[in-house]
C-alpha cells in the first residue's frame, strides 16, 4: 500500500544533498468516463407534485423485485396487486413503504393554531416504538404487521413482502426481500498500484487553525512537496482526487443576515466569500498537479436539494485555468481505469440515520445497495428535484467503489452480492474534525486512511505539560 511504498526510500530524507534531484512522473489515467449525466438537471420545473417520483420509482423497481421474489420464494409464488388480495390467501406483494412516525417533524403540525404546540427540539433519531409501516402500490395501501423490522426500514423503500391479509385488514408479513445488488461489470486487471484520494468536509471558513494546517499538509503530500523520495514516489501514484462535499464550514451559512436591516449589512460581505477564495487557492495547487473532481455538499454554494448541481466555475478564477479541475454533481459516478466509483456527500446516509435504527454508516451504505436505491427517503425527509420520467437514484449498475462523505469516522469493508458482485464501501470522514482522508487502491480495491492530525495532538501534549502557549 501507500505507506509501504514510502518506507522503501525513507533513508533519503536525512541523506546529503545530491547534484541531481529525483523526479517522479504522475501515474497516468488510462481511461476516465464521467457517468453523472442522469444527475444533471436540464429543464428545472418545480410545478409538479412529488407523487410522480414515487410512481416512477415503483414502476422501475417492480421487475427487479418480481424476479428477486421468484428466486427467493420459488418461481410458483403468486405476485399480486393490493386490489387483488383475498383474506387468508398467501401471496407476494410489491410496493413502496410509508413509515408513519409520531416523532417526525411536521411544519403543519407546528404552525397549527388548533394544537398550539411548542416546536419540537431537534433529535439525533426520530424512531419510536409506535412507528407503523404502510405498503402502497399504484391503487391502494395496507398496514403491515408481523416479521418485519419496523425501526430499520424507512419511507420510500420499494420491497416485496410475502404473507396474507388477516381479518383485521392488515397484511401479516411472513418474509420480505429487496431487489439486492444490481449487475456489475468485471474489474480489469491493473499491473501497478494506482490510488484515488477521497477527501470530504474541508470546512474552510470555520476558523480552525489545525484544520487549515492539515489541509495544506494534505495538498503538499499529494503534489509531492512534502516528505522524502519514497513519499514523493508514492504520491506520484495518486491518479485522481475526489473532494466529497462540505468544502465550506457550516459557520459560513450567515442566515441571520436575511433578517437584519439593510443598512446593517450593506457594507459587509458574506462569510463564505473568503472561504471560497481559500478553496480556489487550494484547488489551484491540486489541479496543477493531479486531476481533481469537486462535489458540492450541504454547506456549499449550490442548490440544496438532491441532486446537487456542480459549483459554478466563476467562483474559482484561478483553478479553472486548469483542465484537470472538474466540477461535478452530488451524487457523482465515474469510471476510473475500469473501476466504477459512485458516491455522495453524505446527506442521504445522514437522513437514513435519523429515521432508522441503523447506527453504522457502512451498514447504511450496504443497505442502500441492497434496496438498490441511493436515497429512498427523498423526497419525504430529504429534499430532491421532482423527477417524473425516471428516478435517477435507482442503481442501474453496481459500482465497484461506493462511498459517502462527511462521516464521523473512517470505515471500509467489502461486501458480496448474489451474483458474486464485490463492492468496496468507504465512509470518508469529515476532514475538518478528524484530519483524515482515504486512499483507494484501484489494484485490488483496498482502502486505507491517511491522517494529518499528529501536529494537533503534540500541541495538546505540550499544553498539558505547561509548555504550550
Swiss-Prot record:
N-acetylmethionine: modified positions: 1
By its UniProt entry, which CDD domains does this protein fall under? MPP_PolD2_C
Tell me a GO cellular component: zeta DNA polymerase complex
Q: Which GO terms describe its biological process?
A: DNA biosynthetic process; DNA replication; DNA strand elongation involved in DNA replication; DNA-templated DNA replication; error-prone translesion synthesis
In terms of superkingdom, the source organism counts as: Eukaryota
What quaternary structure, including any partners, is listed in this protein's UniProt entry? Component of both the DNA polymerase delta and DNA polymerase zeta complexes. Component of the tetrameric DNA polymerase delta complex (Pol-delta4), which consists of POLD1/p125, POLD2/p50, POLD3/p66/p68 and POLD4/p12, with POLD1 bearing DNA polymerase and 3' to 5' proofreading exonuclease activities. Within Pol-delta4, directly interacts with POLD1, POLD3 and POLD4. Following stress caused by DNA damaging agents or by replication stress, POLD4 is degraded and Pol-delta4 is converted into a trimeric form of the complex (Pol-delta3), which consists of POLD1, POLD2 and POLD3.
| The protein's name | DNA polymerase delta subunit 2
Question: What is the native source organism of this protein?
Answer: Rattus norvegicus
Amino acid at each position: 500500500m501507500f505507506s509501504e511504498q514510502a518506507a522503501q526510500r525513507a533513508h533519503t530524507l536525512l541523506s546529503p544533498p545530491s547534484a541531481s534531484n529525483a523526479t517522479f512522473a504522475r501515474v497516468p489515467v488510462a481511461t476516465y468516463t464521467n457517468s453523472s449525466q442522469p444527475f444533471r438537471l436540464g429543464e428545472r420545473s418545480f410545478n409538479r407534485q412529488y407523487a410522480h417520483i414515487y410512481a416512477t420509482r415503483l414502476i422501475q423497481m417492480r421487475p427487479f423485485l418480481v424476479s428477486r421474489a421468484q428466486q427467493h420464494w420459488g418461481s410458483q409464488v403468486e405476485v399480486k396487486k393490493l386490489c387483488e388480495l383475498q383474506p387468508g390467501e398467501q401471496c407476494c406483494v410489491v410496493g413502496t413503504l410509508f413509515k408513519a412516525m409520531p416523532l417526525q417533524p411536521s411544519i403543519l403540525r407546528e404552525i397549527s393554531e388548533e394544537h398550539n404546540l411548542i416546536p419540537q427540539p431537534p433529535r439525533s433519531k426520530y424512531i419510536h416504538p409506535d412507528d407503523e409501516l404502510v405498503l402502497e402500490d399504484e391503487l391502494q395501501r395496507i398496514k403491515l404487521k408481523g416479521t418485519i423490522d419496523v425501526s430499520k426500514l424507512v419511507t420510500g423503500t420499494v420491497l416485496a413482502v410475502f404473507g396474507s391479509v388477516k381479518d383485521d385488514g392488515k397484511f401479516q408479513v411472513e418474509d420480505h426481500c429487496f431487489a439486492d445488488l444490481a449487475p456489475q461489470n468485471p474489474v480489469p486487471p491493473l499491473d501497478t498500484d494506482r490510488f484515488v484520494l477521497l477527501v470530504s468536509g474541508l470546512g474552510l471558513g470555520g476558523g480552525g487553525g489545525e484544520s487549515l494546517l492539515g489541509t495544506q499538509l494534505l495538498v503538499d503530500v499529494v503534489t509531492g512537496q512534502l516528505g522524502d523520495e519514497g513519499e514523493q514516489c508514492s504520491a506520484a501514484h495518486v491518479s485522481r482526487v475526489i473532494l466529497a462535499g462540505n468544502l465550506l464550514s457550516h459557520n459560513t451559512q450567515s442566515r441571520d443576515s436575511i433578517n437584519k436591516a439593510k443598512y446593517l449589512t450593506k457594507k459587509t460581505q458574506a462569510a463564505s466569500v473568503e472561504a471560497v477564495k481559500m478553496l480556489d487557492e487550494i484547488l489551484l495547487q491540486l489541479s496543477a498537479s493531479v486531476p481533481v473532481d469537486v462535489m458540492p455538499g450541504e454547506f456549499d454554494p449550490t442548490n440544496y436539494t438532491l441532486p446537487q448541481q456542480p459549483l459554478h466555475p466563476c467562483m474559482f478564477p484561478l483553478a479553472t485555468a486548469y483542465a484537470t479541475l472538474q466540477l461535478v454533481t452530488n451524487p457523482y459516478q465515474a469510471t476510473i481505469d475500469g473501476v466504477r466509483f459512485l458516491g455522495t456527500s453524505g446527506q442521504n446516509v445522514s437522513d437514513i440515520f435519523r429515521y432508522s435504527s441503523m447506527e453504522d454508516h457502512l451498514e447504511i451504505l450496504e443497505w442502500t445497495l441492497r434496496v438498490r436505491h441511493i436515497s429512498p427517503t427523498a423526497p419525504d425527509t430529504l429534499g430532491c428535484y421532482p423527477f417524473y420520467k425516471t428516478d435517477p437514484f435507482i442503481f442501474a449498475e453496481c459500482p465497484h467503489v461506493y462511498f459517502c462523505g462527511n462521516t464521523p469516522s473512517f470505515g471500509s469493508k467489502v461486501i458480496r452480492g448474489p451474483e458474486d458482485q464485490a463492492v468496496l464501501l468507504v465512509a470518508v470522514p469529515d476532514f475538518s474534525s478528524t484530519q483524515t482522508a482515504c486512499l483507494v487502491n484501484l489494484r485490488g480495491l483496498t482502502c486505507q486512511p491517511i491522517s494529518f492530525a499528529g501536529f494537533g495532538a503534540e500541541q495538546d501534549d505540550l499544553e498539558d505539560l505547561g509548555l504550550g502557549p
